[in-house]
Amino acid sequence: MTPVRDMRSVLYATAILFALAILGLRGAFIWFEYRDALDRARAATQDLALLMEEYTKRTLETSDLLLGEIIAFTRLRGGVGALSETGQARQFLADLTRRSSASDLFLIIDKEGNTVAVSTVQPASPVSFSDRTWFKAHRAGAETFVGAALVGRIANEILYTYSRRIPDLNGEFDGVAQVGLRPTFLQEISRPTESDAEDATLGIWGREGRVIARTGLTQDQVSSSLGQTSLFNELASVPS
């Protein structure tokens, strides 16, 4: 006959082992749930990144075609200098805006960096963009340029830009055709959902780390950069 004390010891040991088994199973379930949550978060992030990439690509392709129409219109009428003598350019840009669902503000800039035509209300006097990075790039020979986020001098709101160099009949620099784009798409796809999407920050950054578009971006953050961060440098080193 087993002594009562030994029986109690066996029962205590069994209870302890059972409790440890329960804790082990619970820990395993928590680990599996954690791994599953990570996998789902990773998949959702990849889906968002692909969606943003495709949208950005299509937006820039559409903008490129529309800017091509502006360049053709400009050259057909004798160049950028000739456009300042009539109001046809502003009307053409306004019509182009109505035909486009993605583009918000069209500009034609002369070779000195001053506005010749704007798709919105024409400024009382020409606005100079000669100090902008994109203008300097085109004057130096760049055919196209995707600009970082900025506060528009005409729209006075956060935009990112895509522009093309306008050549004259001899191929020399005659000005710039540009479209300013609002990053509304990022705000739309980052609306809060049951998956805690409100904690996600969506953005597009240039090769040097300058922000092009980002959710929650404020005017005092448009010059921010990720260029010196280890994460950006690691991503930049991955072959495309």
Predicted regions mapped to residue ranges:
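Juxtamembrane extracytoplasmic/periplasmic/luminal helical "stalk" adjacent to the first N-terminal
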Residues: V4-R5, V10-Y12, F18-A82, R98-A102
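A short gly/proline-enriched turn/hairpin at secondary-structure junctions
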Residues: R77-V80, V118-Q122, T215
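Short, Lys/Arg-rich, polar N-terminal cytosolic tail immediately upstream
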Residues: M1-R5, V146
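Extracellular/periplasmic juxtamembrane segments that couple receptor/chemosensory ectodomains to their
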Residues: R207, Q219-S240
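Generic recognition of well-ordered alpha-helical segments
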Residues: D47-E54, L65, E69, Q91, ...
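Solvent-exposed, acidic/flexible segments
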Residues: R42, L60, A82, T86, ...
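Extracytoplasmic/periplasmic ligand-binding sensor regions of membrane-associated signaling proteins
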Residues: T97-L107, K111-T201, Q228
